[in-house]
Regions:
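Phosphate/NTP-binding elements of NTP-utilizing enzymes
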Residues: 1-230
Length: 230
């Protein structure tokens, strides 16, 4: 809890705002509106900022992921700003939760304060060449490998070739396995289907998509049509 603050200015947003105020980065009306929205979050005591999650995401990306050509990934400042918006804002809700007695017989309802992530959707309205696909890759890869629950993710685009621009850097990162996590996840052989599961590769690119076999999580490509996405 000591890292949470309902008054702190987010690190990467603060750097961006200072550059805008100095006149180094011109912004349009839409970006100005988003900056006003973030300033309102900073002022509102109901919303809390935690600096730790985005730093973990940055370390994961820069130690594990690669570009499509296999070169090391170094996150752009814009990525850090976008990631901070996704991972660092929280609010609390009070819920009545059933708590059993220590003996296992009976129980009672208690009111607990539950921490919830504020940002569940993010829209990036930026021009061509802003590396949106690579940012998408970094979010997908982080959630599939760091989240220990079973997840099912979908990436979609107007054409399958465009959708593959998200998957391709991820597959390259798995092939290179430059960081300690991917080295561990790619130990063993994908062809070892008869021996113990511990001897198999745990993070694999298959015909389904990219699978994390430790958590049974999947990232797949789907065509951009209503019937396929539903």
């Amino acid at each position: 809890m000591r890292h949470l603050s309902n008054t702190a200015t987010p690190k990467y947003y603060g750097l961006f705002r200072d550059a805008v105020m100095r006149g180094e980065i011109p912004v349009c009306k839409k970006v100005s509106m988003e900056m006003n929205r973030i300033d309102n979050l900073i002022r509102d005591p109901r919303y809390y900022y935690d600096p730790r999650p985005v730093e973990g995401w940055i370390k994961f990306c820069e130690s594990e992921l690669t570009l499509t050509d296999g070169s090391d990934m170094h996150l752009l400042d814009s990525f850090k700003l976008w990631g901070e918006q996704v991972f660092c804002w929280y609010y609390f809700v009070e819920r009545s939760v059933w708590e059993p007695y220590p003996g296992g017989h009976g129980g009672h309802y208690v009111t607990k304060r539950i921490k919830k992530r504020l940002t569940n959707k993010q829209y990036l309205i930026v021009g061509r060449g802003a590396s949106k696909s690579l940012y998408d890759t970094s979010i997908h890869a982080y959630e599939e490998n760091v989240d220990t629950s079973t997840t099912h993710q979908i990436t979609t685009a107007p054409t399958m070739k465009l959708a593959d621009e998200v998957m391709s850097p991820y597959r390259t990162a798995i092939a290179r396995a430059r960081g300690p996590l991917f080295k561990f996840m790619t130990m063993g052989s994908i062809h070892n289907t008869t021996g113990p599961r511990s001897n198999r590769q745990q993070l694999v690119s298959t015909k389904k998509g990219i699978e994390n076999l430790l958590t049974n999580s999947l990232l797949e490509v789907r065509p951009m049509s209503i019937d396929k996405l539903q």
